[in-house]
Amino acid sequence: MTKIIRFTTNLFDISKEDENPINPIYGQSLLLWLNDKIHNSYDFTTPDYEDWGWYSDITWEGRTYIIGASCLEEEHNNYEWVLQIIKQRSLFEKIFNKEKMTENDKCFLYFKKIIETELSFKNIEFE
C-alpha cells in the first residue's frame, strides 16, 4: 500500500525544474527540497523522472522506499503537490502478506512530520 500526502504551496519555482521528457509533470523541486531537509541522514537518490512525475529512492533502516512527487497547477499559480511513499517488498513478502505499509511506518511518519511542520504548506491531507 502506498501512503500519499497532498498539500498546496507556492514555495517551489517549477520553472526551474528539469524537463520531464516522458510526460510534462513537475515534482522534482519537492524532492530536491526534501533531500536538503534530510541533510544526508539517509541515502536519498537524485530525483529522476517517470511517466507519472518524479521519484527518488531512500534507504530506510535497510529497506528501500520510493518517494514519488508530482504537481498539479490549480488556479492563480496555486499548486497542489502529491508526495507518495512506497515501501518496496520482496515477492515473498507480497505473497505472504508481510511488511505491509501501515499508518505507523517509520519512514512515512518521518516524511509526514517534515510536511506537517513546513508553515508554507496548506491544505495537508493524508491518504
Model features per residue range: what roles?
Residues 1-29:
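Short, extreme N-terminal segment that most often corresponds to the first beta-strand
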Residues 2-4, 31, 76-80:
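A general secondary-structure signal for short beta-strands and their flanking turns/coil
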Residues 11-13, 38, 89:
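Beta-strand elements of well-folded, non-transmembrane domains
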Residues 29-30, 124:
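Short hotspots in intrinsically disordered terminal tails
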Residues 34:
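An amphipathic, basic-hydrophobic helix/alpha-beta surface used to engage anionic
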Residues 41-55, 117-127:
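Short glycine-rich, low-complexity/disordered patches
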Residues 52-103, 107:
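Amphipathic protein-protein interaction modules
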Residues 99-127:
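Intrinsically disordered, low-complexity regulatory regions enriched in serine/threonine/proline
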